[in-house]
From Swiss-Prot:
Superkingdom: Bacteria
Signal peptide region: none
Name of encoding gene: rplT
Keyword tRNA processing: no
BP term (GO), one: translation
Organism, scientific name: Chlamydia abortus (strain DSM 27085 / S26/3)
Name used for this protein in its record: Large ribosomal subunit protein bL20
Amino acid sequence: MRATGSVASRCRRKRILKQAKGFWGDRKGHFRQSRSSVMRAMAFNYMHRKDRKGDFRSLWIARLNVASRINGLSYSRLINGLKCAGIDLNRKMLSEMAIHNPTGFAEVANQAKKALEANL
């Protein structure tokens, strides 16, 4: 009897068609169209998972810029002041602090200001 590998082939096709669920038209039900669409979708998925890290960093920096200007500093001077003061908070933590605890962020910004003045 000839071995066709039908079980493996069927599993592979089912997996691709399952991943294509929600696609439009032939892309969801026909294996050939589904395979190329799923591969393209997975490539975009990989790429955007990498992009997301930079997108969030940009968001944190924009938030910090606004919050630091409210406290009389620019973003770059805030970060420089924090480095001079030896305060080791990352941008995500600072951004969360600026949103949820503005008074605490104001204290941190004041310490950064003092460190900048002491450095001059």
